[in-house]
Amino acid sequence: MGVEGCTKCIKYLLFVFNFVFWLAGGVILGVALWLRHDPQTTNLLYLELGDRPAPNTFYVGIYILIAVGAVMMFVGFLGCYGAIQESQCLLGTFFTCLVILFACEVAAGIWGFVNKDQIAKDVKQFYDQALQQAIVDDDANNAKAVVKTFHETLNCCGSNTLMTLTTSVLKNSLCPSSGNVITNLFKEDCHGKIDELFSGKLYLIGIAAIVVAVIMIFEMILSMVLCCGIRNSSVY
């Protein structure tokens, strides 16, 4: 015997929420793949300075997002199917998966908040080391290539000190030239551009995480209410 009345409304409401959750998983998976293959981040994070690769903390986070998106799509499908079939077993499994996902999201959110500036800091240190080598050593071709890639990708020049900026503009054409010396001298520094690049992407990820967390809370409540409704309906 199927559920009736308010419980039936909850059943279809849970189905709708799960469909939205499934779509959200697809969006997160798509955004993560876009961030993974975004030309700006790819150009910078594939660089190597001698034996030292560029910091890969950002990509670790992206791979986690890809996994989360795929799991969300699976869990969303499980919830849709469990709601339509009115299966207590599937709904219980769905609820357990949601609790685990929610706990992981909270833990990841805390870690991300604590380390939100670390990614940009690591990339800036990598850039500063390459810039220093390129300025000091005329034969540091690898360092020059790294610096020029930063400058051309971000359309910036030098770090956040005027002395380094002026030196790097005048030294070995490391900065992209606009044909105007004054414009080159006052081109935005790369530290600001690096902060802008990563803070924008982290902001996007944060909004997505909050939306998903709200949906998950509603789904956990609805799945338990529906599960209880199914159990009660089978008694009568």
From Swiss-Prot:
Coiled coil: none annotated. GO terms for molecular function: cholesterol binding; integrin binding. Not glycosylated. Residues 34-63, 113-201 are extracellular. One of its GO terms (cellular component) is plasma membrane. Residues 1-12, 85-89, 225-236 are cytoplasmic. PROSITE patterns: TM4_1 (PS00421). Keywords: Adaptive immunity, Cell membrane, Disulfide bond, Immunity, Lipid-binding, Membrane, Transmembrane, Transmembrane helix. It is a multi-pass membrane protein. The record marks K116, K144, K148 as: Important for interaction with integrin. InterPro entries: Tetraspanin/Peripherin, Tetraspanin_animals, Tetraspanin_CS, Tetraspanin_EC2_sf. The chain crosses the membrane at residues 13-33, 64-84, 90-112, 202-224. Its main location: membrane. GO terms for biological process: CD4-positive, alpha-beta T cell costimulation; cellular response to low-density lipoprotein particle stimulus; humoral immune response mediated by circulating immunoglobulin; immunological synapse formation; macrophage fusion; myoblast fusion involved in skeletal muscle regeneration; osteoclast fusion; positive regulation of B cell activation. SUPFAM superfamilies: Tetraspanin. It holds the Pfam family Tetraspanin. It is found in: Cell membrane; Basolateral cell membrane. Disulfide bonds join C156-C190, C157-C175. Cholesterol binds at E219. Gene3D superfamilies: Tetraspanin. Binds cholesterol in a cavity lined by the transmembrane spans. Structural component of specialized membrane microdomains known as tetraspanin-enriched microdomains (TERMs), which act as platforms for receptor clustering and signaling. Essential for trafficking and compartmentalization of CD19 receptor on the surface of activated B cells. Upon initial encounter with microbial pathogens, enables the assembly of CD19-CR2/CD21 and B cell receptor (BCR) complexes at signaling TERMs, lowering the threshold dose of antigen required to trigger B cell clonal expansion and antibody production. PANTHER family: CD81 ANTIGEN (PTHR19282:SF214), TETRASPANIN (PTHR19282). Homodimer. Part of a complex composed of CD19, CR2/CD21, CD81 and IFITM1/CD225 in the membrane of mature B cells. Interacts (via the second extracellular domain) with CD19; this interaction is initiated early during biosynthesis in the ER and enables trafficking of only properly folded CD19. Part of a complex that includes MHC class II/HLA-DR molecules and IFITM1. Interacts with IFITM1. Interacts with IFITM2 and IFITM3. Part of integrin-tetraspanin complex composed of CD9, CD81, beta-1 and beta-2 integrins in the membrane of monocyte/macrophages. This is CD81 antigen. It comes from Bos taurus (Bovine). The gene is CD81.
